[in-house]
């Protein structure tokens, strides 16, 4: 019976990893890549594997609350998952990312491999030096699990705090109808006319460039036919044609520069029209019943975000440990005043399960949303390979989800923390990561507040920056 149950647990773990890997592959190809030209098989495999191991960490947190697997199976799953994820994040991804970048620049395989190895050595040295400035587990080797997890946690928690701080300000700004500007159709039509005029001018310039290039080619052909004429005529013809060709080449370069400027202007106009269309749709949506509900949720989120910012600021200034989540605290107060005949400990356990589940879902959804925004922004601005961007995002994704375990652990009841503490390392300074998160969160939130305030003010003063 025990042997059969062990096989069942192993198949369940492998099946869940395969399912998560397939979901990561689907997300990469359907939501990130879309129409991008380069789809390296190894890059897709690495992304899906990192996605599977990262989401499996959050799945294991739920398994601690809902005993789907035995304690031994969960312990093995935790250790294998952390080991594989750390090997990918600290060793494989930095090496292969550097190797691929060197290969894309035309470096030969042997030199690219040596260059990637040197980069990995420098990366490991910088990774080790980072531990000097932060509290790390004592009496442990650099390549031990607690040391590596602690260093990854610093980077990942910083990333989470920056995203959370921006989200705490941007979420109310996006949801509350107070910040939604009414857009007139005439404003959009005016920009569309400018866009059409810019595109028509760009097309006309490109036609002129082609005609000039054809004339230059014709002059070269006519020069070949002039070889049979006298030396004086050939000399005069060559001088005249060289002057004309130089003038035409200068005209071509000038028109090409104008075309680049027009294309950039067209791109900015298109983005402005797209943003205005979105703002117009948002204004129309805000007048529906769903919009009113979203507006109410926006105010509720604003209150919670202000509460979170104040509590984080209190934690940073007075160095106080974080208190209970406000939702759990309100339910505890409710149970004290109203006896509904439910065991408080049992209800607290279910609330804990629901709260952790919501944390996990919001964490995954929020990260994937920011992942898509970052990918599209980098792919639109830069000319680098999309594979390099995906490898970079794989590194960030693994660090993000691993660090989320360090923070979620504090929200668990004491009986659910045992395995997580043992696997990550009992001497990891868990409280430090919460204080570090609060400090970066406050800085990110206030900086985002200043930027969004400046953006809102400038938008009110000047409605059309590209007119």
From Swiss-Prot:
UniProt keywords, alphabetically: Cell membrane, Coiled coil, Endoplasmic reticulum, Golgi apparatus, GTP-binding, Membrane, Nucleotide-binding, Receptor, Transmembrane, Transmembrane helix
Location within or outside the cell: Cell membrane; Golgi apparatus membrane; Endoplasmic reticulum membrane
UniProt tissue specificity: Expressed in cotyledons, leaves, stems, roots, flowers and guard cells.
Regulation: The GTPase activity is Mg(2+) dependent and is strongly inhibited by the interaction with GPA1.
Protein residues bound to GTP: 381-410
Coiled coil: 243-276
Location, primary (coarse class): membrane
Gene null: resulting phenotype: No visible phenotype; due to the redundancy with GTG1. The double mutants gtg1 and gtg2 are hyposensitive to abscisic acid.
Additional notes on this entry: Has both a topology similar to GPCRs and a GTP-binding/GTPase activity.
This protein's name: GPCR-type G protein 2
Organism: Arabidopsis thaliana
